Amino acid sequence: APSQSTVTALLTSCVSYIDDQ
């Protein structure tokens, strides 16, 4: 399974992308 830091970084990227729309 992915590490917690990887999941957190991916989630942050998704939130930033959505917020930028």
Curated annotation (Swiss-Prot):
Keywords: Allergen
Name of the protein in its database record: Pollen allergen Ole e 7
The keyword Amino-acid biosynthesis appears for this protein: no
Taxonomy, superkingdom: Eukaryota
Signal peptide range: none
The keyword Acyltransferase is annotated on this UniProt entry: no
Organism for this UniProt entry: Olea europaea
